[in-house]
Amino acid sequence: MARSIKKGPFADKHLTKKVEDANKGNKKSVIKTWSRRSTILPDFVGHTFAVHNGRKFVPVFVTENMVGHKLGEFAPTRTFHGHSAEKKAAAAPARK
């Protein structure tokens, strides 16, 4: 279920403050955050965030297409190692 329009998008106050400070000083340093739940606002475009995925910080460069999404969507928490091709190849000749 989507968030109510009258409430507006959620972004942690400490995160918006860091972005405002970076915009005032024209700094483009990496902003480190644990706030995966924050919505990407138009002010965030052009900044790089280091989003925590539970183990390490994943760098996320924000573009215009990302506005409205959550920061956590761009820092995957699970590692996909792929399906094993050996098991399928070994099981195929056994079936007759």
From Swiss-Prot:
Keywords assigned: Ribonucleoprotein, Ribosomal protein, RNA-binding, rRNA-binding
Biased composition regions of type Basic and acidic residues, renumbered to the chain: 9-24
Entry's Gene Ontology cellular component terms: cytoplasm; small ribosomal subunit
Protein name listed in UniProt: Small ribosomal subunit protein uS19
Protein's organism: Anaeromyxobacter sp. (strain Fw109-5)
Role noted for this protein: Protein S19 forms a complex with S13 that binds strongly to the 16S ribosomal RNA.
Residue numbers spanned by region Disordered: 1-30
Listed SUPFAM superfamilies: Ribosomal protein S19
Superkingdom field: Bacteria
Gene3D superfamilies: 30s Ribosomal Protein S19, Chain A (3.30.860.10)
Pfam families assigned to the protein according to its UniProt record, in alphabetical order: Ribosomal_S19
A Gene Ontology BP annotation from the UniProt entry: translation
GO molecular function: rRNA binding; structural constituent of ribosome
PROSITE patterns, A to Z: RIBOSOMAL_S19
UniProt family annotation: Belongs to the universal ribosomal protein uS19 family.
Record's keyword annotation contains Ribonucleoprotein: yes
